[in-house]
Design a protein with these regions (language model features):
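Surface loop/turn motifs at the tips and blade-to-blade linkers of beta-strand repeat domains
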Residues: 37-43, 80-89, 140-146, 205-210, ...
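Asp-box/WD-like beta-propeller blade repeats and closely related beta-sheet repeat scaffolds
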Residues: 120-156
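C-terminal tail/sorting-segment detector
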Residues: 382-384, 411, 428-455
Length: 455
């Protein structure tokens, strides 16, 4: 991931529109969507993350880290067992995970968990070697004396830095003390030291304060906007915009339905509480275009996946907020797969939310008898060939990465055999990763997934 400006993490000029979330009503999925159980038998999967090589990693609260080698692989492979502190009466355990954005060239996986001995919450970097974990390095360690409010979500930001949440450990005052570690989101360099430019000095790892227990942390891959969910006490669960140097108000003087002076209001608050968990900002192209830029977040109390739509060109102003789907188990995390679909973790299963309509198919081998698209070889270490049928004079073929960047395009009439050398229109080499190859013609649209391993 190339660093991007922090323009949406800057507090200056921020104009947040806050809403009190309405009482949500569950109902059927929007037309064309379907929820499919992809994997059963998982044990409290706190985090789902896809690696650029196509593996689906997940963490379990009790310490197991595992992955599915591909989207369709039936059983998981254990990557490691982490010696976590776990007590079912509290919130200790394994909480978060991030895969290095340059994986597998930088073969690192970052885990956040409550360490058993000595007792602490840790951010640890592991190396993936031949499909198993090795060479652990502790990047940061913070107190974990309380069984509650650990947070522990970890994500890479648009600037390439590591963002890690830590709850207040039931010490409300720590959330309002910039020098204390409780109730913060940290911004760290890849070696674990405080990142340059943090708001409270070069030795302070925190980027925001005044939080209670963050279980969701995500970034818009297109423009870098950050969002997080926070769990209130008996009131005021929140969805927040991540703003550099902001104080979100939680502390001894933060009453229910209050807003202490000098603090940043939430984008949305929930009363009664819903216990929000993981979040994801959708930029895929397997769903209708109206879902582009939609924030999805999961909840524990009501077992739902919510969606937030923002006003045009205003990622700090909520347009609509509603329930997308209600599951039959508590929901822990949501992420986007290389197929462009949302993948959701509940307490015992992993789900895939697919979408189909008469003119769009993703990895459908026979979307139309007159229209076809083949990608060979796939995965690829170098050049690939796109074999097309049914392309008319107005046809278009595109290669797009998962952040929405168009790397190469051809407009037609198209040849039935098109070679791609792995470079952009300007000659820039495309990095290792997952790409979508899309053929659009008057007969319809086909999208294929391409895994690029080198070249």
């Amino acid at each position: 991931m190339s660093p991007a400006p922090l323009r949406h993490l800057l507090l200056a000029g921020l104009s947040i529109t806050m809403i009190a979330a309405p009482a949500a009503q569950s109902g059927p999925l929007p037309n064309g969507f379907q929820v499919v159980r992809s994997h059963a038998g998982v044990n409290f999967p706190t985090t789902l993350r896809f690696a650029p090589d196509g593996r689906l990693f997940f963490t379990e609260l009790t310490g197991r880290v595992a992955y599915y080698p591909s989207l369709s692989y039936p059983s998981s492979v254990t990557w490691d067992f982490i010696p976590v502190m776990y007590d079912p009466s509290g919130e200790w355990g394994q909480h978060g995970m991030a895969v290095h954005p340059d994986f597998p060239d930088s073969p690192y996986v970052y885990l956040s968990y409550s360490n058993l001995s000595p007792l602490s919450d840790r951010l640890v970097r592991y190396t993936d070697k031949l499909g198993v974990a090795s060479d652990s390095t502790v990047l940061m360690s913070v107190p974990a004396d309380s069984p509650y409010h650990h947070g522990g979500r970890v994500a890479f930001g648009p600037d390439g830095m590591i963002y890690w949440s830590h709850g207040d450990q039931t010490d409300m005052a720590s959330a309002q003390d910039p020098s204390a570690l409780g109730g913060k989101i940290f911004r760290l360099g890849r070696g674990g030291l405080p990142a340059p430019g943090n708001p409270w000095g070069p030795s302070n790892p925190a980027i925001v304060m005044g939080i209670r227990n963050v279980f969701g942390l995500c970034f818009d891959p297109l423009n870098g906007t950050g969002y997080f969910t926070d769990n209130g006490p008996e009131c005021d669960d929140e969805v927040n915009l991540l703003a550099f140097g902001a104080n979100y108000g939680w502390g001894p003087n933060d009453p229910c339905n209050g807003q202490p002076a000098g603090t940043v209001p939430a984008l949305a608050t929930f009363n009664p509480t819903i216990a929000p968990t993981g979040c994801w900002l959708y930029r895929g192209n397997a769903y209708p275009s109206r879902y582009d830029g939609t924030l999805f977040f999961a909840t524990w109390n009501d077992s739902r996946l919510y969606r937030v739509r923002f006003k045009a060109n205003h990622p700090d102003q909520v347009d609509t907020l509603d329930v997308f789907y209600t599951f039959n188990e508590q929901v822990l995390d949501v992420t986007e797969g290389p197929d462009g679909f949302l993948w959701v973790a509940t307490t015992g299963s992993i789900w895939r939310i697919t979408y189909t309509n008469p003119t769009i198919a993703v990895d459908d081998p026979t979307p139309s008898p007159l229209l076809s698209l083949g990608v060979v070889p796939n995965p690829s270490y170098g050049a690939v060939a796109f074999n097309t049928r049914g392309s008319a004079a107005s046809a278009r073929l595109e290669v797009i990465d998962l952040q929405g960047r168009r790397w190469r395009s051809w407009s037609g009439p198209l040849s039935s055999h098109i070679a791609w050398d792995g470079r952009s229109d300007s000659g820039e080499p495309a990095p290792v990763g997952v790409y979508l190859v899309r053929l659009t013609s008057p007969l319809g649209t086909i999208t294929r997934r391409l895994i690029r391993l080198g070249g």
